[in-house]
């Protein structure tokens, strides 16, 4: 049986919840065909985020890693194409770190592209009635940091494919944020189910 490690961040930026972890946490132990899901909550802290995912990966030995993060203000599920080797945090992370124009990995490549089939994932979500699109920027906060760090780790391992998905706010988060888009947690959770099903029942690179 092959393993998909799916991660979600803890709350940050003054929010009481993070839709990424709310959606991901119930997927732990989920199976479809020859694939099983392992989940991991990730701290929204610069280096600790990557270290947490690496530790989980060393334990469960995944074939694929899908990291999930919140992107408040985006109306769709956005599957990230690329992570850049730059930490430029607009606000402090949960550890109080706020680097400016610093590398994620010293002497690392300028960028890493996701090695998951991003357009196939978007198409699978569309087929399940979920609004989604490819995104060409993961920002420069901890989401980009994690995507870059995990892709760097996967490249070093050589046998893991990795990527990142941003999700909108949950409805409860926008009660006091007029005109901000949101998406029900059940819909967000369905994205992980859709990806696992796609992986289990389609031929993907």
What are these regions (language model features)?
Residues 62, 168, 200-201:
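Proline-centered helix-kink/hinge sites
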Residues 197-205:
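Single conserved hydrophobic/aromatic residue that forms the stacking wall/gate
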Residues 7, 165, 200:
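Single, functionally critical "micro-switch" positions that shape active/binding sites
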Residues 147-193:
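Active-site-adjacent mobile loop/cap segments within catalytic or ligand-binding domains
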Residues 22, 143-146:
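Short secondary-structure boundary/hinge segments and terminal tails
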Residues 139-143, 168-169:
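Small/polar glycine-rich anion-binding or flexible loop at a beta-alpha turn
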Residues 1-138, 152-156, 180-191:
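N-terminal catalytic or cofactor-binding beta/alpha core of small enzyme domains
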Residues 48-51, 144-145, 174:
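Short, solvent-exposed polar/charged micro-motifs at secondary-structure junctions
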């Amino acid at each position: 049986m092959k393993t998909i490690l799916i991660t979600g961040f803890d709350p940050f930026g003054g929010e009481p919840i993070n839709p990424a972890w709310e959606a991901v946490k119930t997927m732990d132990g989920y199976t479809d065909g020859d694939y099983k899901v392992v989940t991991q909550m990730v701290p929204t802290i610069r280096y600790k985020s990557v270290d947490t995912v690496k530790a989980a990966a060393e334990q469960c030995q995944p074939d694929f890693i899908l990291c999930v993060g919140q992107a408040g203000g985006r109306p769709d599920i956005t599957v990230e194409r690329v992570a850049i080797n730059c930490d430029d945090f607009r606000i402090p992370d949960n550890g109080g770190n706020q680097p400016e124009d610093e590398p994620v990995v010293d002497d690392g490549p300028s960028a890493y592209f996701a090695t998951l089939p991003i357009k196939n994932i978007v198409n699978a979500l569309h087929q399940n009635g979920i609004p989604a699109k490819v995104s060409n920027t993961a920002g420069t906060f901890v989401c980009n940091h994690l995507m870059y760090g995990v892709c760097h780790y996967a490249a070093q391992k050589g046998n893991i494919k990795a990527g990142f998905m941003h999700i909108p706010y949950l409805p409860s988060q926008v009660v006091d944020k007029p005109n901000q888009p949101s998406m029900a947690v059940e819909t967000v959770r369905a994205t992980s189910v859709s990806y696992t099903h796609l992986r289990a029942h389609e031929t993907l690179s």
